[in-house]
Amino acid sequence: MSSMFVYVWGTVTDLLHSACSVLALNGDTESSGEHTAPGDTRHGHSSCPTDSRAMEEEEFEILLPEEPEEGTSQDPSPDRSGGFLGDEGTLQTLWLILVGKSGSGKSATGNSILGRRVFESKLSARPVTQAFQQGCRAWEGRELQVIDTPDILSPWAAGWATAQGVGEAGTGSLPKQYAVLLVTQLGRFTEEDQQVAGRLEEVFGKGILARTILVFTRKEDLDGRSLETYLRETDNRALAKLDDVCSRRHCGFNNKGDGAEQETQLRELMRHVEGVLKEPEGCAYSPPATPQPHAAPRESWGLWWLGAKEGRGDQAWLWGLHRILKEPEQAGRQLPPSTPI
C-alpha cells in the first residue's frame, strides 16, 4: 500500500513539474511579444513573422543568382552609353561624314547623333560651318566619330582646306568603316542639292551614292505622315531618282525632339548604316593618287569654281577631310559622356 502511494505521488509530482515548465515558457513568449511590435527593426532585425529558414534561402538567392540557361550568351560589360565593349575592352570605330549645302541642318543633325551640342548650329546668311569639325560618342559597342564638313559647294570650303595646309595631308584612305550622310531639308530639295550629289561623285568617285544615306531634317513637318509615303508621292523627279540611286536608304530627323525621339532616330539611321557597310567595297575607299597640291594664292581661296576647274577645289575639300580624319588617330581619344542638347 505504501509503495503504491509512493508511485502515485511521484507521478503527480512529475505532472505538476511539467505543467509549471509549460506555464513558464508561455509567460516568456508573451513577455517577449509585449516589447516588440510587428515590423519593429530594433537591433537590426525584423520582428515580422518570418521563418528563419525561408529568410536564409532568400538571402542565398540574392547573393548567388541562378546560373544562366544553357545556350544563352553572357554579354560583356556595358559601357556608360548602354553599348558593349569589345573583347579587348575597346570600342569599334565608325565614321559618319555629314555633307550637304549650307542651311540643310548638317550641324544640328550631328548634334542629334552625338546627343549633345558640339557643332555650332544657327540660322545665318553665311555658312556657319567653315571648317571640318569632329565629335565622338560611344553608342552600343561602337565609337561614333561624327565629321561635320563645310558646304561642299561653298567658296569657304576650298579656302579653309588650302589655308590649313592641304599639302600636309598627303594621300591615304578613308577609314575602313564609314558612311556618308547627305543631309537635306524636307520639302526643299533644290538644284543645289543635286549639285551636292554630283560633287560627291566627283570627289569620292562613281558609286559613292550607292553607299550614301539621305537624311531629311525637319521631320516634324511631315505632320504624322511617314517619310516613305512622302518620297513615294513626291513630284520632285530629281529627289526620287537620287533616292533610288542611294538604294532608298533614307531617314528623317527632328533635331528639336526630346532624347527618346532622337534615340529612335539614331537607331533608324544606324540600321541603314549597317546596310551600307554590307555593300560590296562599301567598307573602304581609297582615293586615286594625285599630285600633291600646292597652296593657292590667297586671292583665289574664295574662288571655289575656279579651284574646281584647276583641279584644286575637289582636292582641297578632300584633303581637308583627310586631315580631320587623321587627327583623332594621332592623339589619344577620350569619349565624352552624352549629355542632353
Curated annotation (Swiss-Prot):
Region Disordered, annotated ranges: 28-85
Nucleotide-binding is among the record's keywords: yes
Region of interest (G5), residue spans: 254-256
A GO-annotated cellular component: cytosol
Stretch list, region G3: 148-151
Keyword Protein transport: no
Pfam families xrefs: AIG1
GO MF annotation: an example: GTP binding
UniProt-annotated location(s): Cytoplasm, Cytosol
Biased composition (Acidic residues): 56-72
Annotated GTP binding sites: 100-108, 121, 218-220, 255
Keywords (A to Z) from UniProt: Cytoplasm, GTP-binding, Nucleotide-binding
Domain AIG1-type G residue range list: 91-294
Region ranges (G1): 100-107
Primary residence: cytoplasm
InterPro entries linked to this entry: G_AIG1 (IPR006703), GIMA/IAN/Toc (IPR045058), P-loop_NTPase (IPR027417)
UniProt region (G4), positions on chain: 217-220
Family: Belongs to the TRAFAC class TrmE-Era-EngA-EngB-Septin-like GTPase superfamily. AIG1/Toc34/Toc159-like paraseptin GTPase family. IAN subfamily.
Name recorded for this polypeptide: GTPase IMAP family member 6
Organism in which the protein naturally occurs: Bos taurus (Bovine)
